[in-house]
Swiss-Prot record:
Encoding gene per record: Adap2
GO biological process: heart development
Organism, scientific name: Rattus norvegicus (Rat)
Tissues where the protein occurs: Expressed in many tissues, with highest levels in fat, heart and skeletal muscle. Also detected in kidney, liver and lung.
Listed GO CC annotations: cytoplasm; intracellular membrane-bounded organelle; mitochondrial envelope; plasma membrane
MF terms (GO), sorted A to Z: 1-phosphatidylinositol binding; GTPase activator activity; inositol 1,3,4,5 tetrakisphosphate binding; phosphatidylinositol-3,4,5-trisphosphate binding; phosphatidylinositol-3,4-bisphosphate binding; phosphatidylinositol-4,5-bisphosphate binding; zinc ion binding
Arf-GAP domain location: 9-130
C4-type ZnF: 25-48
Protein name per UniProt: Arf-GAP with dual PH domain-containing protein 2
Residue stretches making up the PH domain: 131-232, 254-360
Key word Transport present: no
């Protein structure tokens, strides 16, 4: 066996070695990484390796299976490995900081990787402090048109408020948003920008959507994590008895599923109309919009639990036919049946799986607090 094959075999054994963490990407957690940084000593996935290529002074990558590895490189990988290197570069990641997963957008992964290895923000000797107040300009989509305009945003973390102004030196904010009602989620495809962020909050019983971006990836991710820090501060005050580990999933959330379906009205005789749907698992709401970038939803369906009589059925009620799309599903609530059609069987399966996941899960502490506050 030549050096090439012998070293490839050693690397593949390292990927499987127990207690190393090498079986998942060191940066996003994707399973079965087949690339590695021989300068840092970590195994990474193909997508994250593309980010590493952007700073060759700090990281240099090779394919585990396709590239040639000399003995010294393999020795370096053997003496390091994912868990060992993560212990160094992720020693002090703040609780509020969003650590991206494999399914997250590129800007989150890129800034996480740069923060770790290039800026070395999370080393043991670095002091960790919350971002605090923040002020700056973001490009915001107009409520009634598709034009993005430069707007000044101000985050007051201690007061738990986010404000934005239409005039750069304006004294009166266009909106004052309470952090307790705020969510932020990257929606790059929907917004059509690689740094696109969707901020939502409750306004007069509806969900107001703000679509923003910044030309700098670092700037938009810093804004995102500053909002998360303010959210965590609020949650600690709202739930003083809950451990931080239970609060972290409540800081911000992504939609469980989004996409187009067609819906009919409460009598099931109304014409089916195409709408954009977004499933919010934490607030247990299925929101629908005329268009994906609308400022407000047209309506929503609250999703309780199976124990409360909420169900989702595959298919349409007998005698009901969709408009263009023939496959569908029916959501049963104590008040009525909601009937939807899906463009494909794949979409139908994904909606059924997502909806059933919400209906089978217990209500979160945040939702229980919101419900008790409303009933009180």
């Amino acid at each position: 066996m030549g050096d090439r094959e012998r070293n490839k075999k050693r690397l593949l054994e390292l990927l499987q070695a127990a207690g190393t963490g090498n079986g998942h990407c060191a940066d996003c957690g994707a399973a079965d990484p087949d690339w590695a940084s021989y300068k840092l000593g970590v195994f990474i996935c193909l997508h994250c390796s593309g980010v590493h290529r952007n700073f060759p002074d700090i990281s240099k990558v090779k394919s585990v299976r396709l590239d040639f590895w000399d003995d010294s490189m393999v020795e370096f990988m053997t003496h390091n490995g994912n868990l060992s290197v993560k212990a160094k570069f992720e020693a002090r990641v703040p609780t509020f900081y969003y650590v991206p997963q494999a399914s997250d957008c590129l800007v989150l992964k890129e800034q996480w990787i740069r923060a770790k290895y290039e800026r070395q923000e999370f080393m043991a000797e670095k002091a960790v402090s919350p971002p605090g107040d923040r002020e700056g300009f973001l490009w915001k989509r107009g409520r009634d048109n598709s034009q993005f305009l430069r707007r000044r945003f101000v985050l007051l973390s201690r007061e738990g408020l986010l404000k934005y102004y239409t005039k750069e030196e304006g004294k009166t904010p266009k909106a004052i948003i309470n952090i307790k009602d705020l969510n932020a989620t990257f929606q790059t495809e929907k917004i059509g920008h690689p740094h696109g962020l969707q901020i939502t909050y409750r306004k007069e019983g509806q969900t107001r959507n703000l679509f923003v971006y910044h030309d700098s990836g670092k700037e938009i991710v810093d804004w995102f994590n500053a909002l998360r820090a303010a959210r965590l501060q609020y949650l600690k005050l709202a739930f003083p008895d809950l451990p931080e580990s239970e609060l972290v999933p409540l800081i911000t959330r992504n939609y469980l599923k989004q996409g187009f379906m067609e819906k009919t009205g409460p009598k099931h005789r109304e014409p089916f109309k195409k709408r954009w749907f977004a499933l919010d698992p934490q607030e247990r709401r299925l929101l629908y919009y005329k268009n994906p970038l609308d400022a407000f939803e047209q309506g929503q369906v609250f999703l309780g639990s199976n124990e409360q009589g909420y169900e989702v059925w595959e298919g349409l009620p007998q005698g009901i036919r969709g408009n263009r799309w023939k496959v569908g599903l029916t959501v049963i609530t104590p008040e009525r049946k909601f009937v939807f059609t899906c463009p494909t069987e794949k979409e139908q399966r994904e909606w059924l799986e997502s909806l059933r996941g919400v209906l089978s899960s217990p209500l979160s502490p945040l939702h229980l607090l919101t419900t008790s506050a409303k009933s009180g």
